Regions:
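Carbohydrate transferase catalytic cores enriched for Leloir-type hexosyltransferases
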Residues: 1-380
Length: 380
């Protein structure tokens, strides 16, 4: 099968949708090598992000010819990709980041699949500009309704796509995200290298994600101040936004600024080692499409404390713990419990590793392939 992808995130985004997109291609190239995979991106972006993908003979990257560079990314993606896809005799096109090229809506004999990651802009409009909410609703909704099949990364998002966009239930399938297998194989020297290079504290709890209001890092800072264990620090790894100033101000006011470590633009090389050195992983986000950092932590053998109210229970499973995202006392109590109760800690680690076996690359490649094959049956 010839399968094409919108690769803008693969070539340009180091985290989030970029990680998801690269994971999908890594899983498919390893477990479905008989297919041909064509990546269409408006720019070469950051080659270090996808260099290993291009080592597979089944993968080809296509970017605009210099003569077409003036079109800009959006125009090229919406009007040139459909023509290129048909010329390449592509069987199926998968939009990995919430949308399909406009011209593909009317394309003949090309199956279409789109992944919708979340509808947070509808559920939590206060975190988005009005113009962004309008654009997202139009693009995501049009793509979901036009695609032959919609993939969601959680059951919660599946229900949202069905209820909000009116897509038929049989056209929406949940295929969970996964993470690199290197998080399950962290070596002691990786932990040491990360600790030395980044000057990490000896003992810490960990948060990974953008430092933005929706991720709710303030709750972790407030819990840090209430812990029985005053030797434990908080390490937060992620992109900074203006919200970071609120976090710093709160930490200063609570007297825990010296125990807060904000790491920005950390290389992917060090991330497994950072996980490996943590005693507990905290993720009090108010809303997520899924929660990949939770999967990474469980793979690394780190007890996870998430938050109620979205789909984090799907990512963390039944033996992870969950706090009310507005209750710092509750989060502090759960952290203390994980640190003190050795039996609980061992149970969370062992059961967590068993739970994340459902998010392996092999299983996800299988589930995606089943969707692709189902779509292509309608074109026979």
């Amino acid at each position: 099968m010839n399968i094409a992808f919108d690769a803008k995130r693969i070539t340009n985004n180091a985290t989030g949708l970029g990680n998801y997109s690269r994971f999908v291609l890594e899983a498919l190239t390893e477990y479905r090598p008989e297919n041909r995979y064509l990546l269409y991106s408006p720019s070469i972006g950051r080659p270090e992000l996808y260099r290993e993908l291009l080592e597979h003979r089944s993968v080809q990257l296509h970017t605009p010819h210099r003569a077409l560079a003036f079109l800009g990314g959006s125009l090229w993606r919406n009007y040139s990709i459909p023509r290129l896809v048909r010329e390449a005799k592509v069987d199926l096109f998968h939009g990995l980041s919430n949308e399909l090229p406009l011209g593909l809506y009317r394309a003949q004999r090309v199956g279409t699949v789109v992944t919708i990651h979340d509808l947070a802009f509808i559920r939590y409009p206060q975190y988005y500009k009005p113009i962004d909410r309008l654009l997202y609703r139009r693009k995501y909704g049009a793509s979901a309704r036009a695609a032959d099949h919609v993939i969601t990364v959680s059951e919660q998002t599946r229900r949202d796509v069905i209820d909000i966009f009116g897509v038929e239930e049989e056209r929406v399938t949940t295929v969970y995200q996964g993470c690199s297998e290197r998080f399950a194989q962290i070596q002691p020297e990786e932990v040491t290298a990360a600790r030395q290079a980044l000057r990490l504290p000896q003992r810490y709890m960990l948060f990974v994600g953008s430092i933005e209001e929706r991720k709710n890092l303030l709750l972790a800072v407030e819990a840090l101040a209430q812990l029985q264990d005053k030797e434990l620090h908080l390490v937060a790894v992620g992109r900074r936004t203006p919200y970071v100033q609120q976090v710093l101000d709160r930490a200063r006011r609570l007297g825990v600024l010296s125990r807060l470590h904000l790491l920005h633009q950390v290389g992917a090389t060090y991330l497994p080692g950072i996980y490996g050195g943590a005693e507990v992983f905290v993720y009090p986000s108010r809303f997520e499409g899924f929660g990949i950092p939770i999967i990474e932590a469980l793979n690394a053998g780190i007890p996870v404390i998430g938050a109620t109210g979205s789909c984090l229970e799907e990512a963390g499973g039944p033996t992870s713990l969950y706090t009310d995202p507005d209750n710092a006392d509750m989060l502090a109590s759960l952290i203390d419990r994980v640190l003190i109760d050795i039996s609980l800690r061992r149970l969370m680690i062992d059961e967590g590793r068993s739970y994340v076996e459902r998010f392996t690359p092999k299983r996800i490649a299988r589930d995606l392939s089943q969707v692709y094959e189902q779509v292509m049956l309608t074109y026979e």
